[in-house]
A protein has these predicted regions:
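Conserved beta-sheet core of the metallophosphoesterase superfamily
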Residues: 228, 255-266, 270-271, 278-285, ...
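Short, amphipathic alpha-helical "recognition" segments used to contact nucleic acids or chromatin
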Residues: 2-19
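Core catalytic region of metal-dependent phosphoesterases/phosphodiesterases
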Residues: 119-120, 124-137, 145, 150-252, ...
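Basic, amphipathic N-terminal segments that precede the first structured/catalytic domain
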Residues: 31-174, 368-370, 382-386
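Short alpha-helical "recognition helix" segments of helix-turn-helix
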Residues: 23-26
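Histidine-centered active-site/metal-ligand motif
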Residues: 32, 138, 242-244, 288, ...
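Flexible, charged surface loops at secondary-structure boundaries
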Residues: 16-17, 124-126, 172-175, 278, ...
Length: 386
């Protein structure tokens, strides 16, 4: 017999009636542990009779705290001395992200696709393919040279990215395909308050929300258009980061809508924090790197892609998040390698205060479809003249 799902209101009434959790679980054909988790969720909405609280907030507005007015107890007071209480709630981040993603998909559904960019280059090899990870661009970041040693804003970011990316593409071989990867944190902030959605950290930003949002989409188009001119086929991998849970996913929808008429580009929007590409004997995984330990990624790949794991001989993860290039000493796990990539923006005030420092640049990694990893790796660093 299928279990009857108990609603929040039914559970509330059962508890008000004094029924024990073990009896409620039996009545609704539920396990005791599942019911206890439901009670925990119910308490998050404001139901806590042990502390004289019986509120009924929406599930997507969990209680963040209480402000209670108390006085010396009198006969008319509650047992706790409470006179009035204000319930403070917060918007559940996961529900907020899901709602925002649906809204974004609806808003951009009518975007007119861009004209198809013709391929006029030539293909030197189809046995290899190029991967270009764009490490944590943090578009919108602003730094002050007197504080961190270098000025950085939207205008500087646009100029530097164009110069460095052009030099990189010039030096890369003309493989048939390029895998262009947004490794996450494309935008420095995620809302109009200039914060991340997860931590609500206040960030140093160059101007208003719309200003750096527009600049970011222009820079992303520059990356993709340049790759479409050089490579016959482009696979765009979008991986949202911890700085841009919502806007990072919006990038995937935006790019897909703009280039949906171009058969030379395939877009992975970023619905999952883990994205995969298989080419010949090579299986690649892409993640920002903030949702789990890097050492857990080989097992994650084997679990998610167990069929492709068995059909390939070389497996490799490419991640962002840590802002430094670890390919020289990247970690070799049984059956899989894991590396992180560097970034182009300078360190912000927080990183500067923590004595962080690393070379700044972008790289192209050439993989061989038959043998896997190729020692060919071309890196372009930021120059003082950029």
């Amino acid at each position: 017999m299928a279990a009857t799902k108990i609603t929040h209101e039914q559970l509330r009434e059962e508890l008000r009636a004094g029924n024990k959790p073990v009896d409620i679980a039996k009545a609704y054909s539920m396990s005791h542990s599942v019911l206890l988790r439901r009670i925990k969720k119910l308490k998050a909405t404001g139901y806590d009779p042990a502390n004289d609280r019986d509120y009924n907030n929406p599930e997507n507005h969990p209680v963040a705290g209480y402000s209670t007015l108390v006085r010396h107890k009198s006969a008319s007071d509650s047992s706790t001395g409470k006179v009035l209480e204000w319930v403070k709630t917060r918007v559940d981040v996961r529900n907020q992200m899901d709602a925002a993603t649906a809204m974004i998909d609806t808003m951009i559904a009518d975007i007119k696709p861009l004209p198809v960019i013709p391929f006029k280059n030539y293909v030197a090899t189809s046995d290899q393919f190029t991967v270009i990870p764009i490490g944590d661009p943090h578009i919108g970041l602003m730094t002050w040279s007197k504080e961190v040693g270098e000025d950085w804003d939207i205008k500087i970011a646009d100029r530097v990215y164009r110069k460095v990316f052009k030099r990189l593409l010039t030096n890369l071989p003309d493989t048939e395909e390029c895998v262009l990867v947004n490794t996450g944190d494309f935008f420095h902030a995620d809302n109009i308050q200039g914060e991340t959605s997860r931590s609500r950290h206040k960030l140093d930003l160059d101007g208003r929300h719309g200003k750096w949002l527009d600049a970011g989409f222009v820079i992303m188009r520059m990356f993709i258009d340049a790759c479409l001119r050089k490579f016959k086929k482009v696979e765009f991998i979008n991986v949202p980061g911890n700085h841009d849970d919502i806007l990072g996913r919006a990038i995937g929808s935006y790019v897909w809508q703009l280039y949906r008429d171009n058969e030379r580009i395939n877009v992975q929007k970023g619905d999952s924090p883990f994205q995969y590409v298989r080419r010949g004997n090579v299986l690649l995984g892409f993640a920002h790197g903030h949702t789990c330990k890097l050492s857990s990624l080989p097992g994650k790949m084997a679990d998610d892609q167990y069929k492709l794991w068995g059909r390939t001989t070389y497996r490799h993860w490419i991640c962002g998040h840590v802002h430094h290039n670890s390919w020289v000493q990247f970690k070799e796990h049984p059956g899989c390698k894991v590396e992180t990539v560097g970034i182009i923006p300078p360190k912000d005030a927080y990183a500067h205060g923590g004595a962080y420092g690393a070379d700044r640049g972008i790289q192209g990694i050439i993989f061989d479809k038959k043998i896997g990893y190729s020692p060919r790796r071309i890196e372009e660093t930021v120059r003082g003249t950029d």
